[in-house]
């Protein structure tokens, strides 16, 4: 007689989900402060993270988040593109403030900035990528929760959740689990009940996917109801014989009256030039006739002053 299958607990279901999302895969390097969370090392050098400790750290982080009265005092930040959608979804369901993208230096330390804020808790995706907000949070005594891989630096990190923080499925799964735990502790979701929000909403999506789907659709050619392509079209023009002469076309030059030519002036020549008052004879027989020199103007005559002789 086969024994009935035992129903999995909530922790076992979460661990199976994290296995499917490859949360347990680390890197080939291991920080000395992350050795306590490593389960084993594979033959190819990849460190395997203990998902049991990951689940416990998620519970600890959820308790810290629930302990803050105003959710707007919590900042969830991710500079990594794979975590930006998950950060926005986490803030949507938990009420926290999300910062998706590059961190503006001085957000937590420079009071002259318009984006200055003093949060009570900071949640990050990667301590290596988000190193600037971690340093500023340390200067402002802000507790920090971060998802740490096996090679992540643990400096200034108060609660490090060991997990794969480089995969888009891993990051989405972690934020989904953390959001569900927070809602369960707030009694928004009844304990033991399934959350109706799918984990796929927290996954990163490629922005080119909708464009590719639109390009695959074949646009049908419009049907104008023409069945006989040899039929007469365009107001009587032959559809099949385009080279035939068109006899019915109006003659555009028939209605235009002929213009009589302008009569030439008798005895005139194009090369003739007007007579110039000059003593130098100028040849005016052809097209290469030279231009007339300027006319000399006599100097004014002043009484009592002799005219210039030209040597002055």
UniProtKB/Swiss-Prot annotation:
Per the record's keyword annotation, is Cytoplasm included, yes or no? Answer: yes
Which Gene Ontology CC terms are recorded? cytosolic small ribosomal subunit
Specify whether Metal-binding is a keyword of the entry: no
Signal peptide as annotated in the record: none
Keywords of the record = Cytoplasm, Ribonucleoprotein, Ribosomal protein
An annotated GO BP? translation
Top-level taxon: Eukaryota
**What does the record give as the function of this protein?**
Required for the assembly and/or stability of the 40S ribosomal subunit. Required for the processing of the 20S rRNA-precursor to mature 18S rRNA in a late step of the maturation of 40S ribosomal subunits.
Provide the assembly information. Component of the small ribosomal subunit. Mature ribosomes consist of a small (40S) and a large (60S) subunit. The 40S subunit contains about 33 different proteins and 1 molecule of RNA (18S). The 60S subunit contains about 49 different proteins and 3 molecules of RNA (25S, 5.8S and 5S). Interacts with ribosomal protein S21.
What protein name is recorded for this chain?
Small ribosomal subunit protein uS2
Species assigned in the record:
Vitis vinifera (Grape)
């Amino acid at each position: 007689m086969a024994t009935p299958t035992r129903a999995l607990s909530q922790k076992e279901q979460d661990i199976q989900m994290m296995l499917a999302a490859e949360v347990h895969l680390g890197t080939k390097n291991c920080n000395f402060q992350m050795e306590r969370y490593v389960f084993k090392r594979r033959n190819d050098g990849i460190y395997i993270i203990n998902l049991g400790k990951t689940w416990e750290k998620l519970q600890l982080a959820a308790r810290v988040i629930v302990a803050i009265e105003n959710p707007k005092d919590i900042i969830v930040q991710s500079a990594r593109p794979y975590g930006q959608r998950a950060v926005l979804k986490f803030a949507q369901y938990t009420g926290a403030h999300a910062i998706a993208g590059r961190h503006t230096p001085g957000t937590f330390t420079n009071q002259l900035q318009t984006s200055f804020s003093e949060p009570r808790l900071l949640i990050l995706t990667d301590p290596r990528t988000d190193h600037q907000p971690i340093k500023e949070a340390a200067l402002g005594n802000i507790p920090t929760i971060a998802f740490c891989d096996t090679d992540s630096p643990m400096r200034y990190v108060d609660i490090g959740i060991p997990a794969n923080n480089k995969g888009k499925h891993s990051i989405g799964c972690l934020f989904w689990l953390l959001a569900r735990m927070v809602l369960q502790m707030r009694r928004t979701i009844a304990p033991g009940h399934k959350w109706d929000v799918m984990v796929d909403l927290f996954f990163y999506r490629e922005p080119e996917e909708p464009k590719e789907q639109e390009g695959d659709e074949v646009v049908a050619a419009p049907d104008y109801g023409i069945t006989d392509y040899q039929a007469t079209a365009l107001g009587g023009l032959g559809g099949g014989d385009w080279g035939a002469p068109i006899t019915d076309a109006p003659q555009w030059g028939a209605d235009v009256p002929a213009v009589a030519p302008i009569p030439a002036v008798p005895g005139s020549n194009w090369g003739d030039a007007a007579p110039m008052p000059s003593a130098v004879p100028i040849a005016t027989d052809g097209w290469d006739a030279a231009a007339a020199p300027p006319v000399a103007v006599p100097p004014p005559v002043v009484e009592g002053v002799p005219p210039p002789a030209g040597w002055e």
